[in-house]
């Protein structure tokens, strides 16, 4: 699943020449989708295919509904220092994993099928939390591996802001079962 960051009334960052992040991310997402779809063994889906707003949780829900194997959220940030440049890759932090697990446990609708189709409805709450924590930890490890691969590829075509995968608690990366990067 390819997520073009921002959209609709949420324009994201504004470039020095007046460009909007939402337009840049959508253009990149469409090009990436085409490149992936050109490989007969792969199929890409977009979380949004035009200029409209999709809530952060809705992006993750769509990826899960479409049974995505990976989730890539594309952003084109701006910074107050015009000298700042380069690409970065983020994965969810371990500290974010705990809050993601708590969020999913609190929401009974989403409790089932979070970890490989195993329903947690009939499990002891502590066991369910442990299973979600284990699933989230494994997913974060896979996300960092994916992020390192992407950084290697990006380094061949663009400057890197940081040469390692950074980790933070981005809401859009909090799927406990889909390796996700931003």
Describe each PLM feature range.
Residues 80, 131-182:
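Active-site-adjacent mobile loop/cap segments within catalytic or ligand-binding domains
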Residues 1-124, 136-148:
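Catalytic-core regions of hydrolytic enzymes
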Residues 125-129:
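Exposed acidic/Ser/Thr-rich ligand/metal-binding surfaces
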């Amino acid at each position: 699943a390819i997520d073009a960051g921002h959209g609709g009334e949420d324009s994201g960052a504004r470039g020095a020449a007046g460009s909007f992040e939402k337009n840049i991310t959508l253009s990149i997402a469409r090009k990436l989708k085409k490149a992936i779809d050109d490989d007969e063994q792969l199929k890409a889906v977009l979380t949004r295919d035009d200029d409209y707003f999709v809530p952060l949780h809705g992006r993750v829900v769509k990826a899960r509904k479409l049974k995505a194997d990976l989730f890539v959220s594309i952003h084109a940030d701006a910074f107050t220092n015009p000298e700042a440049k380069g690409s970065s890759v983020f994965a969810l932090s371990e500290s974010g994993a705990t809050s993601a697990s708590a969020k999913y446990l609190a929401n009974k609708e989403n409790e089932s099928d979070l970890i490989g189709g195993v329903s947690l409805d009939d499990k002891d709450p502590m066991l369910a939390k442990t299973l979600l924590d284990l699933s989230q930890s494994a997913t974060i490890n896979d996300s960092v591996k994916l992020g390192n691969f992407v950084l290697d590829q990006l380094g061949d075509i663009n400057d890197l802001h940081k040469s390692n995968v950074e980790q933070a608690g981005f809401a859009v990366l909090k799927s406990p079962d889909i390796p996700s990067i931003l």
